[in-house]
Amino acid sequence: MKLFVWRRVGLGALTIVLTTFLVHLALYAAPGDPIGYLLNGQPATPERVAALREQFHLDDPFFVRYFSWVSDLLTGDLGISSSFNSEVSMLLATRIPTTLQLVLISIVFIFGFGLSMGIFAGLKSGGFDSFSMTIVTILSSIPAFVGSYLLINFFAVQLGWFPAIGSGDGSVLSTLWHMTLPAIALALSAGSYVARTTRASVKVESSSEHVVTATVRGIPRGKILSRHIIRNALLPIMSLGGLLLVGLMVATAFVEQAFAINGLGSLLVVAARQQDFALVQAITLIMVVSFVVVNLVVDILSWILDPRMRSDGA
C-alpha cells in the first residue's frame, strides 16, 4: 500500500513540476521582449515596466527566474493581475468557492442521473434499454454552451422557474436555486458518459462467471446486485474521475459565461481575452493540481476497493 501511494504521489508531483516549468516557459516562447506582451497595450511608463520586470524576474537568468517564480508561488504570491489591477490570490479567493459549488452540484446530477440510468439500462433489455440509450446519446451530443442557452430560454425565460443569471446571495437555498440550471448544463455530457459506461459495466458483470454461479446457488437477487454486479460495475466509473474533472473545468468557462456567474471559468475567459498572463498561469496551475489530486484519490480508492489491483501488485 505504501509503495503504491508513494509511487502515485511521485508521479503527481512530477506532473505538477513539469506543468510549472511549461507554464513559466510559455511567457518566453513568443518572439520579442516579454514586456511588450505583458503590457498588452497599456502605457509603457518606466514605473509600469519596472514593476513587470520585478514581478516576473525578467532581469534574472531563465532558471533563476523560474525558481524565483516557484518560490513566490509557494509563499502565496501569485502576482498582480493586469486586467483587474489586483492581487491574483485575492481574485482567486473570491471566485474558487463559486466554481466549487457549481461543480459539486453538477457532480450530484452527473452521478444521480448517470448511475441510475446506466444501472437500470444494464439490468433491463429491450425497449427501456434502447429508449434510455437514445436519450443518453441525444444529451451527450449537446455542447455545454448550447445546453446553457436552451435551459435559460425554456426554464428561466419561458417558465420563469429559475433565475437566468447569477449565483445567488450566499444562502443555501438561493445558491441551489441559482445553480440548478448551470449544474444541469454542466452535467449533460458527463452524465450521459457515466450512464453509458455504467450500462456497459453492469451488462459485463451480469454475465460474469461469479454472478452466474451465485445465481445457480440460489443467492437472493438483491445480494447479487449489491455485492457483485453494482459494486464491481462502479469500479470503472471511479477511474473516470480525473477525466470528468478536466471536462467539467473546461465546460465551466462556457457555462459561467452563459449564466453570468463570477467563477473561475469565466475569470479564465476574461484573463485569456485580456492576455493577463499572471492570472492565466495561476488558473492553469489550479486546474492541473486539481486533476492530479483527484486522480491520486481515485487511484487509492480503486486500489482499496478492487482486489484485482492488489493481487497484480499495482
Predicted regions and their residues:
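Hydrophobic alpha-helical transmembrane segments of membrane transport/permease proteins
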Residues: 15-64, 159-178
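Hydrophobic aliphatic residues
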Residues: 26, 30, 38, 42, ...
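Alpha-helical transmembrane segments of integral membrane proteins
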Residues: 2-3, 13-19, 90-129, 144, ...
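An internal, D/E-rich "acidic patch" concept
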Residues: 59-115
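Short hydrophobic helices that act as membrane-entry/anchoring signals
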Residues: 3, 7, 64-68, 72, ...
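Alpha-helical transmembrane segments and their helix-start/interface "positive-inside/aromatic belt" motifs
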Residues: 8-14, 134-136
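Phosphate-coordinating loops and pocket residues in cytosolic domains that bind phosphorylated ligands
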Residues: 7, 40, 64, 133, ...
